[in-house]
């Protein structure tokens, strides 16, 4: 009973944190609403044309100076280790100048989330989805829509099978993109040996 209550409470908090910030958007516009959402999840961001980053501290506290930049789109967002999910991504949908999105270690980022990133196909240049436990090989196929991507980090994804082959497929899908893939055994010879052994068994 206690475990079920804790699970429901956790799920409720996740939904609450990722709710669409329509009220904030109606008063301050989409850029401020996106900024507030990022900070509320203890993330950080940088506006277009600005060098300063706005970040929440470990306690979730942040400066309200970001309100002084109404109608200024976000260029970089760091949501690493936050609980952003597919639903919450709606709060960033109107950020069509977003060039960098860091999602390292996000426990709720999954294949559905990756499929929705096509919204940023005209602007996104750098994407970090390393250490995300819910991403699978099938989800990575959706990244083919991000034709402008220049840097992609897919390091240490536990849900990826045959990482060596997956990296090759990613390089074929995104030939202009530099792919970082640490934390895997890239020994393709081992894969070839396993395939050859399987063929011999079938004979």
Mark where each language-model region is.
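Long, contiguous C-terminal flanking segments immediately downstream of a protein's structured core
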Residues: 2-20, 24-30, 41, 74, ...
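LRR N-terminal entry segment and analogous cap-like coil->beta motifs
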Residues: 10-27, 32-115
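Concave beta-strand-loop units of leucine-rich repeat
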Residues: 19, 77-84, 97, 103-109, ...
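The leucine-rich repeat
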Residues: 84-88, 93, 109-113, 135-141, ...
């Amino acid at each position: 009973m206690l475990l079920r209550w804790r699970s429901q409470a956790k799920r409720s908090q996740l939904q609450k944190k990722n709710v669409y910030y329509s009220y904030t958007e109606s008063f301050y516009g989409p850029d401020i609403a996106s900024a507030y959402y990022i900070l509320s999840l203890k993330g950080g961001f940088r506006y277009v044309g600005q060098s300063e980053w706005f970040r929440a501290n470990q306690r979730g506290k942040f400066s309200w100076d970001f309100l002084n930049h109404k109608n200024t789109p976000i260029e970089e967002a760091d949501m690493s280790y936050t609980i952003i999910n597919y639903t919450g991504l709606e709060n960033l949908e109107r950020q069509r100048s977003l060039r960098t999105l860091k999602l390292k270690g996000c426990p709720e980022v999954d294949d559905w989330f990756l499929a929705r990133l096509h919204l940023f196909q005209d602007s996104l240049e750098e994407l970090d989805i390393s250490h995300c436990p819910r991403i699978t090989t099938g989800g990575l196929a959706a990244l083919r829509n991000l034709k402008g991507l220049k840097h992609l980090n897919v390091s240490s994804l536990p849900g990826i099978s045959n990482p060596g082959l997956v990296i090759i497929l990613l390089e074929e899908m995104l030939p202009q993109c530099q792919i970082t893939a640490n934390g895997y055994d890239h020994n393709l010879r081992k894969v070839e040996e396993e395939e050859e052994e399987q063929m011999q068994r079938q004979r």
